Amino acid sequence: MIPDVSTALSWLEANPQALKGIRRGVEREGLRINANGSLAQTPHPESLGSALTHKWITTDFAEALLEFITPVDDDIDHMLTLLRDIHRYVARRLGDERLWPMSMPCFIDSAQPIELAQYGSSNIGRMKTLYRKGLKNRYSALMQVIAGVHYNFSLPLAFWQAYAGIRDEASGKEAISAGYLRLIRNYYRFGWIILYLFGASPGICPSFLNGRKTDLLFEQAPSGLIYLPYATSLRLSDLGYTNKSQSQLNITFNHLDEYVRGLKQAIKTPSADYQRMGLQRGGHYLQLNTNVLQIENELYAPIRPKRVTRDDESPSDALMRGGIEYVEVRSLDINPFSPVGVDEEQARFLDLFLIWCTLAEAPEMSAEELRCTRTNWNRVILEGRKPGLMLGIDCGSTEQPLTILGKSLFSDLRRVAETLDSNNGDTHYQLVCDKLVAGFDNPELTLSARFMDQLIEHGIGGLGLILANDYRQTLRDEPLQVLNEAQLDEERLRSWQRQRSLEVADHLSFDEFLASQNGR
């Protein structure tokens, strides 16, 4: 059932100014490919700066997996224009390479080398590469080059002052953290709606399976595309990045100290599987350690509570110091119809949904219920557009049609949209609501359905190259709008200076450094 939020919505409508100053940021991943679609084997271009220290342009798992990061912004249009500027700058410096425009990779098989991201000779740079080596050995490299979009979101202090009655961030950090944890619990219960609306990986390249066993009953198009007819986001299925050893972790989102305690336990709990793998072979490290998680970021989660860390501070220590500062939403596939992988409609919907998640009551959630929510997510992932699809309520004790749940949720979201629009003197959020809600009566309007039509017509490889070539030319031709070449060139030079400073400042051997990090 959708919780009753009428009282909270009435409060919001009486206090619209509480939503002025929402802050957001986007992180977009994208694989560098050659003109024929194969994975680029070149190093991260020096002309883009240091992947270790650049503020806006870095790499994720692989040397070829770029990641673009926008600064925190209180204006969606400005944020997306800045993201596009970064793409424009990069497109002009990739030579004949381009970005693969979707989440699921293609033209890659298990025999093709996937170079781990390299970050220089500093201890911290070597540790980042070794962490990725551990991921490769634990889950395979192919799983790690699946790309996505992360959306970082925080409500303004004025909201928490009005809603929770706090004075300032420092004295009110417990109330703010409790509010964000409520958001996260509701996200687990209802976040399947993001996959329904914006899932964009309903099919995969045959090479992605490459003999792997699966229970999924795939169909195959004449183009070779392997797909499930009603799927939304195979990226988030068991085909994608999962960690079976994590399924036994009892990490919950009811209280911040509980969450941090569970996370810290996971990075100190030995794994029999990873102990058998070994820490070193032939004098070379295979992973950072043999625990269930090498570091906290290895925890698979569709949403994370976050705080900006200080130097040499772990994510969980930062949370305990200052409380939750923002949430990181990790459930967005690359939008193949956007040159930058995400669009304004998606950002506005996420604003609405995350505000709703903050306002709606969210009873505490046991580890068992947390696992139960995965059932609904899996149904939407694998057959979200199936007519008459039912979703479980209260761990499956009852069921309701997805369409009924979705439309009920949108009736609340539209009230949030009206409040946000009243602050801005326009109707942007309401228009997004009106457009997206139509997808519940007409599943063919969803992103996965529209993408599937194109995939079946062109094949995933053919369509990927059509879009990649189109976006490459478009971005190369467009002038920068928010940033300028001089700013980006300066950040490139400064990033190399910062990397060199880290390298000369090291006073521990790598073995000593690693021991100090594992002992924290």
From Swiss-Prot:
Catalyzed reactions: L-cysteine + L-glutamate + ATP = gamma-L-glutamyl-L-cysteine + ADP + phosphate + H(+)
EC number assigned by the record: 6.3.2.2
Transmembrane parts of this sequence: none
EC class name: ligase
GO molecular function annotations of the record: ATP binding; glutamate-cysteine ligase activity; metal ion binding
Pathway(s) annotated for this protein in UniProt: Sulfur metabolism; glutathione biosynthesis; glutathione from L-cysteine and L-glutamate: step 1/2
One record GO biological process: glutathione biosynthetic process
Record keywords, A-Z: ATP-binding, Glutathione biosynthesis, Ligase, Nucleotide-binding
Cross-referenced SUPFAM superfamilies: Glutamine synthetase/guanido kinase (SSF55931)
Pfam annotation, one family: Glu_cys_ligase
An example Gene Ontology CC term for this record: cytosol
Similarity section: Belongs to the glutamate--cysteine ligase type 1 family. Type 1 subfamily.
NCBIfam families the UniProt entry points to: glu_cys_ligase
Name of the protein described by the UniProt record: Glutamate--cysteine ligase
Source species taxonomy: Bacteria, Pseudomonadati, Pseudomonadota, Gammaproteobacteria, Enterobacterales
Gene name for this UniProt entry: gshA
